[in-house]
């Protein structure tokens, strides 16, 4: 079931990252208190990595039991292990290498020099199997229940590696697919699909900067998900857009309360 998006607009991208990090700490701690563990889907890009860096610098990060946290990824650039452009490599540098995570609960997407070689479709199928193995009978489909799933929003409204009009955004059954011919490098990627994204309890969409203003306006104005993938990303209980003032500059103020600016 779709949830109407809530908007929170911060003064600048630094404040947005700090506030989002504080919000994420609270969600993780609450999930661990109520269910014993938490499950979060990370996003790459400047806003996703900025949030992780803010979390690394937050004293309250120690409230998290890092050994009871599962980390997944919404998408990945299909490159060799350790490549600096891979989302997992950047996440390790920003946060993961500085906290006591259980390595078995860090679920990176396959690399192009892994057991599946350069077969991105086989790599995507393997990640789908890993998700299915972690799902329980109480979960919504063949994926575990994600407490928070974060997505960066591209200037073209793409989220994860779901680009406008490409086959991946049209997928209705599979939870993970390989992407061929992405319009930004590298062209080959692995991504969660919209059906997988929509199983999350909460979906957070992050956008900062003037180059994201038109994308936010399009996605929040009722555009179709094939033309504007961000419009099709929503959670079961909450959909949250976290923006800075520049990214919100083309939105009518009626969409968000003045107090959030």
Positions of predicted regions on the chain:
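N-terminal glycine-/serine-/threonine-rich phosphate-binding loop
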Residues: 1-40, 121
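Ligand-binding beta-strand-loop-alpha-helix segment within the catalytic cores
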Residues: 3-4, 64-147
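Glycine-rich N-terminal segment of FAD-binding domains in flavoprotein oxidoreductases
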Residues: 32-58
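Glycine-rich beta-strand-to-loop/alpha-helix junction loops that act as flexible
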Residues: 42-47, 151-155, 208
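Short, conserved loop/helix-junction motifs that constitute active-site signature segments
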Residues: 60-70, 99-101, 168-169, 195-200, ...
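Class I SAM-dependent methyltransferase SAM-binding "motif I" and its flanking Rossmann-like core
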Residues: 148-195
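ATP/nucleoside-binding phosphotransfer catalytic cores, i.e., glycine-rich phosphate-binding loops
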Residues: 195, 201-261
């Amino acid at each position: 079931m779709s949830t109407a998006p809530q908007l929170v607009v911060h003064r600048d991208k630094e404040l947005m990252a700090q506030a989002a990090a504080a919000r994420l700490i609270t969600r993780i701690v609450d999930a661990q208190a109520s269910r014993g563990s938490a499950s979060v889907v990370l996003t790459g890009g400047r806003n996703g990595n900025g949030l992780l860096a803010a979390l690394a610098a937050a004293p309250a990060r120690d409230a998290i039991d890092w050994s009871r946290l599962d980390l997944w990824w919404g998408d990945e650039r299909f490159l060799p292990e350790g490549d600096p452009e891979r989302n997992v490599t950047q996440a390790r540098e920003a946060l993961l290498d500085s906290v006591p995570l259980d390595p078995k609960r860090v679920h990176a997407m396959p690399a192009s020099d892994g057991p599946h070689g350069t077969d991105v479709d086989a790599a995507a199928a393997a990640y789908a199997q890993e998700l299915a193995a972690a799902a329980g009978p109480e979960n919504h489909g063949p994926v575990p229940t994600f407490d928070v799933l974060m997505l960066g929003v591209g200037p073209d409204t793409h989220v994860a590696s779901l680009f406008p009009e490409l086959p991946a955004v049209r997928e209705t059954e599979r939870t993970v697919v390989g992407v061929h011919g992405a319009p930004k490098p590298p062209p080959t990627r692995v991504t969660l699909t919209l059906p997988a994204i929509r199983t999350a309890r909460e979906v957070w969409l992050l956008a900062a900067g003037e180059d994201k203003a038109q994308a936010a306006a399009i996605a929040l104005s009722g555009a179709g998900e094939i033309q504007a993938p961000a419009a099709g990303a929503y959670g079961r209980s909450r959909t949250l857009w976290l923006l800075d003032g520049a990214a919100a500059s083309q939105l009518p103020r009626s969409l968000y309360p003045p107090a959030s600016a």
